[in-house]
Structures are given as C-alpha cells and as structure tokens.
C-alpha cells in the first residue's frame, strides 16, 4: 500500500473515531503437512485447492503463483465437512494422481480433528500458514505504543492496578 493510499485511509478512518491506525498485509509461508510434518510441497507441484473461507479469491490467486492448480473445491465459509466432500476429494485424487491437497490452516484444523479422513487425504494434505506483517515500520509504533500502555498497568482479570500505586505501598 502506497504512502498516499495510507494517508487517504487514515483521513477517512479518523472521521469515525480517534484511534491509532496500523497497516498490515498477509504473507503466505511455506505449506505444511498437518499429518506428516517432514513432508514438503515444492514450488510447481500439482495441487487441488480447497477452501471453506469467506473470500477465497486471494488465497487461490496466491496458490496459483507458487503451484500448478489442477482442480479447485471451493466451499462456503464455516463449511462442515461431510463424507460426500471427502469422497469428492478422493475422486479428484484419482483424476490427478500426482496432485496434493492444499487448503487453508482453518480448514486443515477441521479436517485434522476428524476421524473420518481417509489415509490418501492425510498423505497428500498440506495447508498454507499465513503471517501478518506491518507495512513500512508501523510495527515499531505499534509495539512502542503497546509497551507504553503496558508499562503503567498490570491487568488481572477485571482488576487494573497502576504500578506506581503498588510501588508506593
């Protein structure tokens, strides 16, 4: 995001409420296998992309930059996986025998908890962890502000104590 775009957003957001504004971006990291951590997904590998998130466009676009997408299975946000979904995935694996499954971390957590996931899916499943990065040094401002806010207070549930008051007692 350009500095000009950041200034425009700040101007608009400050009309709503006085608050600090920090700009971040989401950065994908290396794909991970939830069942076999030693396995790796290599750039250019064939993948079947599956997601059950609200707006999968950015996820799919990012995957296409790194891997060869041979099929997509896009589901609704908060999708509850069924045996029919797992059977559909198995059919896609039969059609694309070299493909791996690449999904979001959110969907991988759901599938990892299920006892019904067939071995072929476990063997080929990877997820794409995401990392949040601050844009243009705003992390220093964020962490500096957070440190300043925390330096004067200790929070214990609903009880807030000022450190200076405790020191003087």
At which residue positions do the language-model features occur?
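ATP-dependent carboxylate-amine ligase
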Residues: 1-169
């Amino acid at each position: 995001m350009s500095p000009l775009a950041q200034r425009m957003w700040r101007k608009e957001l400050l009309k709503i409420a006085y608050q600090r504004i920090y700009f971040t971006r989401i950065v994908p990291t290396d794909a991970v296998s939830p069942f076999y951590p030693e396995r790796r997904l290599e750039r250019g590998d064939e993948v079947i992309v599956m997601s059950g998130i609200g707006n999968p466009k950015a996820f799919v676009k990012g995957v296409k930059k790194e891997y060869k997408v041979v099929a997509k299975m896009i589901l609704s946000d908060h999708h509850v996986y069924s045996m029919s979904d797992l059977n559909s995935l198995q059919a896609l694996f039969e059609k694309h025998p070299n493909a791996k499954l690449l999904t979001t971390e959110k969907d991988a957590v759901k599938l990892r908890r299920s006892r019904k996931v067939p071995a072929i899916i476990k063997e080929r499943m990877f997820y794409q962890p995401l990392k949040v990065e601050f844009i243009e040094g705003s992390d220093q401002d964020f962490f500096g502000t957070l440190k300043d806010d925390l330096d004067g207070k200790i929070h214990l549930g609903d009880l807030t104590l000022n450190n200076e008051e405790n020191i003087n007692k």
